[in-house]
Amino acid sequence: MTLVGKLLNAKPGEAVIRKVDLVYAHDGTMPLIIEAFNRIFNEVRTRAYIFFDHVYPAPTVKVANLHREIREFAKIHGIPVVEGKGISHQLVVELGLAEEAKIIVGGDSHTPTLGALGVFAVGMGATDVAIALGLGKIWLKVPESIAVLLDGSPREYIMASDVMIHLITSLKDREMSYNAIEFFNVPFSFDERLTLTNFSVEANAKTAIIGEEYEGGGYSDEITIELDSLPPMVAKPFSPANGVSVEDVEGTKIDQVFIGSCTNGRFEQIKRAAEILDGEQVNVRTLVAPASINVYRRMIEEGLVRILIDAGVVILPPGCGPCLGRHMGVAGDNEVILSTTNRNFRGRMGSPKAEIYLASPVTAAVSALYGEITNPEGEL
C-alpha cells in the first residue's frame, strides 16, 4: 500500500471525508478565504494558523488594509497570526505544528512541502480551505502514487533542486493531476528533503511525501534517478519543466540572482551559497532571503551574514521576498533573473518581459560571482 493510502486509510480513486488536523494560510490567500468562510460559516472548528509572509511589511495602502482585515478576522475566531517571522511552510515545521498530524490543508499550492514530515499535506483553493476551517474536515479523492527512488550519492555540487528540475522535466508530458510523488532512499538532509516535496507541486502532483524503506506494491509507476551521474540542472523560461544541464545555458548573462524562498531559503542552503561567496565579490545584484527568523538568527550566529554582506549581497527580511513579484527586488523589463525558487512563469517575479531561470543555491552562488550562468563543477 502507498504511503498516501496508509495515511488516508483508503485506496487510490476513492472519495473520502477525513478530519483535518491543521489548516493554515497566508496574507496572499486569506482575503478570499475570509470571503468564502463568511458566506457559509460563523465558527472555526479546527486548529488554524495565519502567516504574514508573502507581502510583508505592507508595501502599499491596499495591502495594509488587507492585513488589517485578516487581523480582525483572526481576532474574532481566535486564530494565531504570525507576522514577519518567515514563510508559512517553514514556520509550520519550526513551530512543531505538524507534529502528530496526519492531514494538513493549506491555503497555498506549496503546502505539500510538509510531506517531508511524513504527513498528507495538500494545498487547496479559498472555498475548500474555508470549508476545512468551518467543518474541521474535508473531502478528498485519494491520488495514485508514483514511487521515485534515489539511487547513489550526489556529487558535492548537486542539490535537491537539481534532482527536482530533472524529475519535473521528465514528467512534463505525463498527466499528474491526481498523482502523488513518494520519495524513497533519500540521501539528503532534512532541509533538502523539504525542497523535494516543495518542488513536486511543479510536476502538477497533488502532494508529495518522503518514506524510508520502499516496500513496493500499489504504485502506478516507479522512477529511479541516478544521483551519481546527475548534472547541475537549470530550468529555462518559462516553465520549471524546461530543465537542461547547466552546460546548455552556461554563459547566459544575468541581471539578478535570488537565493531563498520556501524552496531554498533554509539554513543549509544559504550556508552552501555563503561558503562559495566567502572572501569573494558578486558581479551582479544578489539577494538572499532567509525562510524564517530562526534561519536568519543562525546566519548571524554562525557568521553567514558577515560573509554575505562582505560579498556584496543584499539580505532581505525573512519571507517570500521577490519570488511572487510583488516587492523586494522585482524583475524589470528584459531583465534576466537566476532564482532558486520553484516557478519561472512569464511575469512571475515582476515584468512579463523578464526571463527567469531556476537553479540550485550552489549554481546560483557560483553564477553570481561571474554575472552569468556558470557550471559549479570545477568551481568547488
Curated annotation (Swiss-Prot):
Q: Which cofactor does it need?
A: [4Fe-4S] cluster
Origin: domain of life: Archaea
Q: Which GO terms describe its molecular function?
A: 3-isopropylmalate dehydratase activity; 4 iron, 4 sulfur cluster binding; metal ion binding
Record-listed E.C. numbers: 4.2.1.33
Q: Which SUPFAM superfamilies match?
A: Aconitase iron-sulfur domain
Which reactions appear under catalytic activity for this entry?
Answer: (2R,3S)-3-isopropylmalate = (2S)-2-isopropylmalate
Binding of [4Fe-4S] cluster occurs at 262, 320, 323
- Pfam families noted in UniProt: Aconitase
Which pathway does it operate in?
A: Amino-acid biosynthesis; L-leucine biosynthesis; L-leucine from 3-methyl-2-oxobutanoate: step 2/4
Entries under InterPro entries matching the protein = Acnase/IPM_dHydase_lsu_aba_1/3 (IPR015931), Acoase/IPM_deHydtase_lsu_aba (IPR001030), Aconitase_4Fe-4S_BS (IPR018136), Aconitase_4Fe-4S_dom (IPR036008), HAcnase/IPMdehydase_lsu_prok (IPR011826), IPM_dehydratase_rel_enz (IPR050067)
Biological-process GO terms, alphabetical: L-leucine biosynthetic process
The cofactor note reads: Binds 1 [4Fe-4S] cluster per subunit.
Entry keyword set: 4Fe-4S, Amino-acid biosynthesis, Branched-chain amino acid biosynthesis, Iron, Iron-sulfur, Leucine biosynthesis, Lyase, Metal-binding
- Report the function annotation for this chain: Catalyzes the isomerization between 2-isopropylmalate and 3-isopropylmalate, via the formation of 2-isopropylmaleate.
Complexes and interactors = Heterodimer of LeuC and LeuD.
Family, per the entry? Answer: Belongs to the aconitase/IPM isomerase family. LeuC type 2 subfamily.
Q: Any idea what this protein is called? A: 3-isopropylmalate dehydratase large subunit 2
Q: What is the lineage of its organism?
A: Archaea, Methanobacteriati, Methanobacteriota, Thermococci, Thermococcales
